Amino acid sequence: MNTRLLSITRILTRALPRSEIVIRRTVQQPVTFPSTRLQCRYQSTMETAKTAADQLANPAKKLKIEQKTIGTHNGAFHADEALAVYLLRLTPTYKDSPVVRSRDPPTLEACDIIVDVTGVCDHTKHFDHHQRTFTETFSEKHVTRLSSAGLIYKYFGKEIISLKTGIEETDPRVEILYQKLYSEFIEAIDANDNGISAFPSSAGAPAFSEKGITLPSMVAGLNPRWNETITDEISNSQFEKASKLMGDVFVDKLDYYSKAWLPAREIVVDAVKKRFEIDPSGKILNLGISCPWKEHLFNVEEEEGIKGETLYTLYSDGKGWRIQAVSVTKDSFENRKGLPEKWRGVRDEDLSSLTGIDGCVFVHASGFIGGNKTYEGALEMAKRAVAE
C-alpha cells in the first residue's frame, strides 16, 4: 500500500471509529478494524483513496447505509395500512423507512416488504388480505379476519411491545400485552376494514351516527378531497398524517396498558395469593388501592382454577375504604353476591347502627358498593356480607 493511501486510511479509521473498513490487498488477508454494523469494502487503491478523501473533505457526511422500503397501494388509504406502516417503522429493520405507494407490480416488488396490496400473503415480504383464499385470524379464539394492520401486528407485535416497554420478548407480560392490544384495539381495525359490524343487523338502526368520531372515519377524512387537485405528493403527505394518527393512538394505548393496566394485574395476583390471610373464607380480596382490577380478577381466577369464588374486594379511595361486590362478568351489572338488602340506601350513623359496625359511610341502593372510614370497618362489612 502506498504511503499516501496508508496515511488517509489511518486518518479515516480514527475519524470513523464505529465503521468497519476492510482494505483488500493484492496478496495478504484483509485488514479489519473493529466496528458495529457498517462495512466498507474497497476494491481498488484509487477507489479507497477517493472515498477517504471525500470523507475528510466532508466530515459531516455519513457513509451511505442502504435503507429498506415499505410498499403499499396508492389512491384512497384506510386505517389498516396506515397503522401497518407505522407499526413496521417501530421495528429496527424498518425504522424511518420510506413508503412507496403504487399499484405497479414491478415497483412494489422492488420494496423490501409490501402491505395491503398484491393479493399475496407469505408472512415474510407480502402481507395482503384481499385475496378470496385468505381466512387468517389472530388466533383460534378470534373469528375476525385480519386486515393488513392485524397481519403486521400478529407477526411483529411482540417485537414492538418488547422494544417499546423494555420487557424481554419471552417475558409472560409481553404475551399479556400482545393479547390485550389486539382485543382492545387492533381487532376493531381488522373488523372495520373487512366490513364487519360490531352489532348484528337485528339490533336495528343506531340511535345516532358515530362515524365522525371513529379512527377509520378520521383516517378516511384525511384523503384528498374529490374536488381538489390531487397529486402524488399531496396524497402521500396525507397518508403520512393518517399513519401518524393511527400510530400515536397505538403507542398511547401500549403506554397505558404497560404502565397502568398491567401493574394492576400484579396487585390482583398478590391479593389472590393472600386472600386466606384476609378471611378464612377466601372470598374477600384486599387490593389496598383503587386500580383497574376487574378484568384481571376474572383472568387470574380462571388461571388459578377458582372461577367465581371471590365475592368482594376492598380498596382505599384516598379518604376511606370501599367494599365492592364482584360482578358476574367483567361487564355485567349483576353481582355474584350484592351487599345485604337491608343495608342498601342507608348512610352514615344510621348504617352503623343498623350493622353494628363503626365508621360506616354508605351502601349503594343497588348493593354493588359501600364505604367505611377505616379498613377494619370495611373488612367487617365484607365478612358480614359473606356470612349472610
Functional labels for PLM-detected ranges:
Residues 266, 273-388:
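Gly/His-enriched, cation/cofactor- and phosphate-binding structural elements
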Residues 4, 14, 58, 64, ...:
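Short, flexible coil/linker elements and helix-boundary hinge sites characteristic
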Residues 1-45:
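N-terminal mitochondrial targeting presequence
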Residues 186-290:
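Hydrophobic, aromatic-enriched interface-forming segments
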Residues 96-98, 170-171, 266-268, 304-306:
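Short amphipathic alpha-helical surface micro-motifs
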